[in-house]
């Protein structure tokens, strides 16, 4: 069980957060939702998830990889503690990875929208994460990476009115 709060930062309309990040003062933690920890291989839930491969988001809603009723058990931050596959990463002063370990964990996750995270960028909790992110961007640019900013599009369908 991890002591520090982790943050699932996503669109305000997201209902199934599947990743979160934290910094404990030494390590960057990246958490991925871990339904495989409780879904039995070849069970109906497993077979259905493998057949779908991913959650499909369409204007009318979402065709979920895992059933809607399972969502609270597998998404991050919908319960007090969430099961996760967690990557503990030690970074050097430039943000390059020095060491990485993987653990099955229980994590406390606070959900934030992108807008909320931006407002809290200078807060004690999020400032280290933003610093790590900016170092990573700079390191990638120095290595020749090209950054393309694309607008995010969200389409919703309203019921037809007569």
List where the protein language model places each region.
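Electropositive polyanion-binding surfaces
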Residues: 1-162
């Amino acid at each position: 069980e991890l002591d520090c709060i982790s943050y699932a930062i996503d669109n305000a309309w997201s209902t199934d957060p599947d990743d979160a990040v934290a910094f404990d003062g030494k390590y960057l933690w990246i958490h991925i939702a871990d339904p495989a920890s409780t879904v039995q291989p070849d069970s109906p839930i497993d077979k259905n998830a493998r057949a779908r491969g991913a959650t499909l988001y369409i204007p009318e809603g979402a065709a979920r990889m895992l059933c809607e009723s399972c969502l609270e058990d597998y998404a991050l931050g919908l319960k007090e503690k969430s099961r996760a596959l967690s990557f503990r990463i030690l970074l050097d002063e430039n943000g390059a990875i020095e060491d990485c370990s993987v653990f099955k964990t229980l994590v406390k996750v606070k959900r934030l929208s992108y807008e909320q995270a931006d407002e809290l960028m200078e807060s004690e909790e999020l400032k280290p994460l933003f610093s790590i992110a900016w170092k990573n961007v700079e390191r990638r640019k120095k290595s020749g990476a090209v950054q393309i900013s694309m607008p995010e599009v969200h389409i919703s369908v309203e019921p037809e009115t007569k």
